[in-house]
């Protein structure tokens, strides 16, 4: 399993990450179709790590420790898996949930596994003038500090949303492939450098 993005562990490939910074993957959201109807009440009663409160939410919420994830399992057989730190771990976790459902007596399959969202983050290690950035990139930016402390930057290519904080911390969301996360960060990095706050 390649788990890139551990700062300081290997030298950064500057051809792919010219900024010298590799965003760390924080959360992967994936979906899969178990391709059979499920009795959620029966699953909740038999599985140790499951909760089901149909008045609150129409899915069983199941958790496993390894990889540390949460699954939402719907009566239609659709499942959402969140919390994994890499695509491989997300798929591994989804397979484990499918196996748990199989062991409870349902003919669960593993169809159409798909990564739906990758959330990454990084720290450029310098403060950013968000007002200036918002003003000069008004078409892509929304910045209302009294509502939310970060600037929301909607990049068109790749179609990614970045949350940019004055501290230099960046959250990158909306990618379906990790390379989009990396590309979006490399696209924004020169802009962040341009609006670097000069320390007095």
Swiss-Prot record:
<feature type="modified residue" description="N-acetylthreonine">
    <location>
        <position position="2"/>
    </location>
</feature>
<comment type="similarity">
    <text>Belongs to the TBP family.</text>
</comment>
<feature type="repeat" description="1">
    <location>
        <begin position="25"/>
        <end position="101"/>
    </location>
</feature>
<dbReference type="GO" id="GO:0006352">
    <property type="term" value="P:DNA-templated transcription initiation"/>
</dbReference>
<dbReference type="GO" id="GO:0005634">
    <property type="term" value="C:nucleus"/>
</dbReference>
<dbReference type="InterPro" id="IPR012295">
    <property type="entry name" value="TBP_dom_sf"/>
</dbReference>
<keyword id="KW-0238">DNA-binding</keyword>
<keyword id="KW-0805">Transcription regulation</keyword>
<dbReference type="InterPro" id="IPR000814">
    <property type="entry name" value="TBP"/>
</dbReference>
<keyword id="KW-0677">Repeat</keyword>
<comment type="function">
    <text>General transcription factor that functions at the core of the DNA-binding multiprotein factor TFIID. Binding of TFIID to the TATA box is the initial transcriptional step of the pre-initiation complex (PIC), playing a role in the activation of eukaryotic genes transcribed by RNA polymerase II.</text>
</comment>
<dbReference type="InterPro" id="IPR030491">
    <property type="entry name" value="TBP_CS"/>
</dbReference>
<dbReference type="InterPro" id="IPR033710">
    <property type="entry name" value="TBP_eukaryotic"/>
</dbReference>
<protein>
    <recommendedName>
        <fullName>TATA-box-binding protein 1</fullName>
    </recommendedName>
</protein>
<dbReference type="Pfam" id="PF00352">
    <property type="entry name" value="TBP"/>
</dbReference>
<dbReference type="GO" id="GO:0003677">
    <property type="term" value="F:DNA binding"/>
</dbReference>
<keyword id="KW-0804">Transcription</keyword>
<comment type="subunit">
    <text>Belongs to the TFIID complex together with the TBP-associated factors (TAFs). Binds DNA as monomer. Interacts with TAF1 (via N-terminus). Interacts with MEE12/CCG1. Associates with PWP2 in the nucleus. Component of a nuclear protein complex containing at least TATA binding proteins (TBPs, e.g. TBP1 and TBP2) and ATX1.</text>
</comment>
<keyword id="KW-0010">Activator</keyword>
<keyword id="KW-0007">Acetylation</keyword>
<keyword id="KW-0539">Nucleus</keyword>
<feature type="repeat" description="2">
    <location>
        <begin position="115"/>
        <end position="192"/>
    </location>
</feature>
């Amino acid at each position: 399993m390649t788990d890139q993005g551990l700062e300081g562990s290997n030298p950064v490939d500057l051809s792919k990450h010219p900024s010298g910074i590799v965003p760390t993957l924080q959360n992967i959201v994936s979906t899969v179709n178990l391709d059979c109807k499920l009795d959620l009440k029966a699953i909740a009663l038999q599985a140790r790590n499951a909760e089901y409160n149909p008045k609150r939410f129409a899915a069983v919420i199941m958790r496993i420790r390894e990889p540390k994830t949460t699954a939402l399992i719907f009566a239609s057989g659709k499942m959402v898996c969140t919390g994994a730190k890499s695509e491989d771990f997300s798929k591994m976790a989804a397979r484990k949930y499918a196996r748990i459902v199989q062991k409870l007596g349902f003919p669960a399959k593993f169809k159409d596994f798909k990564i739906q969202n990758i959330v990454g983050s990084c720290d450029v290690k310098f403060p950013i003038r968000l007002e200036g950035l918002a003003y000069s990139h008004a078409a892509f930016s929304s910045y209302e500090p009294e509502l939310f402390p970060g600037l929301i930057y909607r990049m068109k290519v790749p179609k990614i949303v970045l949350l940019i904080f004055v501290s230099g911390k960046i959250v990158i969301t909306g990618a379906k492939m990790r390379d989009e996360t990396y590309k979006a960060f490399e696209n924004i990095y020169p802009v962040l450098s341009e609006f670097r706050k000069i320390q007095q």
